[in-house]
C-alpha cells in the first residue's frame, strides 16, 4: 500500500542519517572551524566554535 512505501522511505532516510557521525553535521564549541554553519551552537570566532550567548 501507499502507507507501506511511505514508511519504508522514512526508514531509509532515518538509517542514512544515523550512519553519519555527528561531527559531519556540526561541531561542539571550542572545536576548530572554518565556517559558522559547522558549529552546533553559536558563531565561529578566531577559528573556533564559540557557544551562543544564550548558553552562558
Curated annotation (Swiss-Prot):
What residue stretch is flagged as signal peptide?
Answer: 1-2
Keywords attached to this Swiss-Prot or TrEMBL record, sorted alphabetically, are: Disulfide bond, Ion channel impairing toxin, Knottin, Neurotoxin, Secreted, Signal, Toxin
Per UniProt, subcellular location reads as: Secreted
Spell out the residue numbers of the propeptide: 3-25
Recorded GO cellular component terms are: extracellular region
Where expressed (tissues)? Expressed by the venom duct.
Extract one GO molecular function annotation from the record: toxin activity
Record flagged with keyword Signal = yes
Q: Does the keyword Transferase apply?
A: no
The record lists its disulfide bonds as: 26-40, 33-44, 39-49
About its domains, the entry says: The presence of a 'disulfide through disulfide knot' structurally defines this protein as a knottin. The cysteine framework is VI/VII (C-C-CC-C-C).
Name the protein family. Belongs to the conotoxin O1 superfamily.
Protein name, please? Conotoxin Bu12
Q: Write down the species.
A: Conus bullatus
Amino acid at each position: 500500500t501507499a502507507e507501506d512505501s511511505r514508511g519504508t522511505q522514512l526508514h531509509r532516510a532515518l538509517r542514512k542519517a544515523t550512519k553519519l557521525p555527528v561531527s559531519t553535521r556540526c561541531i561542539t564549541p571550542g572545536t576548530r572551524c572554518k565556517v559558522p554553519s559547522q558549529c552546533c551552537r553559536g558563531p565561529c570566532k578566531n577559528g573556533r566554535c564559540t557557544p551562543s550567548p544564550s548558553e552562558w
